[in-house]
């Protein structure tokens, strides 16, 4: 018979934001301190993830923070013509401030403020929860540019993102600004059903994991947002139950899954072996488990 509307409505509600806002403010102040080694350089600090996109649920506590240095940038030149690539190479000036040094300086800034609560993870610098302060994952990043045209510094076109390096030294580029902006536009175009439906899927995922029906880590929130981002606007509306059924039917019977995109519209949503796309098998495992739970409720 499906999951009752009352349950879906409960799942659709946004979690508390007061503690996360306070945590973000504390982390941001530490990163923007005048005592940091990167003070005076051009950088920005912003929220990403569930709190940044208003898709957080009650069970969530981690706050995702990005510090991005704009004085140095990495580039993707694969879309440039040979002539434009030559022009880029002639204009390029190597940076003297390395990513490794910047991340170390960010680590020092956080350690200066939070002491032993700070640890380096594979991708993020983790600031442990303490008292009313929530756990924060801080990504130290540099500007990233995917170039489409380069005739000179004042005659170029590129999509701007961020990039960072994981523990294995692999460069990971992403586009949080585009993700957030596109998600908000889609939310408005869907008559404001999108973000509550993301929260429904996230709570459903939590229940699947708690019930032993889905392995933890297979369905990150970022990809659930991406999945619903692809669903046509007319599939949203009337009730959460209708939204769920219409979305799942569209994904399973109408969508060309190879053409689904991430909400940033820079990467395909389903792709094998990358840090920026959802493994197809993981996506199928979540979708199948979600439909099964719906049918057996």
UniProtKB/Swiss-Prot annotation:
Cofactor binding remark: Binds 1 Mg(2+) ion per subunit.
Reactions it catalyzes: UTP + ATP = 3',3'-cUAMP + 2 diphosphate
Listed GO biological process terms: defense response to virus; nucleotide metabolic process
Cofactor: Mg(2+)
Organism domain of life: Bacteria
Keywords: Antiviral defense, ATP-binding, Magnesium, Metal-binding, Nucleotide metabolism, Nucleotide-binding, Nucleotidyltransferase, Transferase
More about this protein: This is a complex CBASS locus with the loci capE-cdnE-probable diadenylate cyclase-capV-dcnV1-cap2-cap3.
Family: Belongs to the CD-NTase family. E01 subfamily.
Name by which UniProt lists this protein: Cyclic UMP-AMP synthase
Organism of derivation: Escherichia coli
């Amino acid at each position: 018979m499906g999951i009752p509307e009352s349950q879906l409505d409960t799942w659709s509600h946004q979690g508390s934001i007061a503690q996360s806002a306070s945590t973000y403010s504390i982390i941001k102040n530490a990163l923007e301190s005048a005592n940091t080694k990167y003070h005076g350089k051009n950088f920005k600090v912003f929220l990403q993830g569930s709190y940044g996109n208003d898709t957080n649920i009650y069970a969530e506590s981690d706050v995702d923070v990005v510090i991005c240095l704009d004085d140095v940038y990495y580039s993707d030149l694969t879309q440039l013509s040979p002539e434009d690539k030559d022009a880029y190479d002639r204009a390029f000036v190597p940076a003297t401030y390395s990513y490794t040094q910047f991340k170390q300086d960010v680590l020092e800034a956080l350690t200066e403020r939070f002491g032993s609560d700070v640890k380096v993870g594979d991708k993020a610098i983790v600031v442990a929860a303490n008292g009313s302060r929530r756990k924060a994952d801080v990504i130290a990043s540099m500007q990233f540019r995917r170039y489409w045209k380069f005739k000179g510094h004042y005659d170029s076109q590129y999509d701007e993102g961020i990039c960072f390096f994981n523990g294995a030294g692999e460069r990971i580029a992403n586009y949080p600004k585009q993700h957030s902006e596109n998600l908000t536009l889609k939310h408005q175009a869907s008559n404001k059903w999108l973000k509550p439906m993301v929260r429904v899927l996230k709570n459903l995922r939590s229940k699947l994991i708690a019930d032993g029906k889905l392995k933890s880590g297979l369905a990150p929130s970022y990809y659930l947002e991406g999945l619903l981002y692809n669903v046509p606007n007319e599939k949203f509306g009337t009730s959460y139950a209708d939204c769920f059924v219409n979305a799942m039917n569209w994904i399973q019977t109408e969508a060309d899954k190879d053409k689904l995109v991430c909400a940033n519209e820079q990467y395909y949503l389903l792709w094998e072996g990358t840090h920026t796309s959802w493994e197809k098998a993981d996506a199928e495992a979540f979708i199948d488990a979600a439909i099964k739970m719906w049918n057996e409720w």
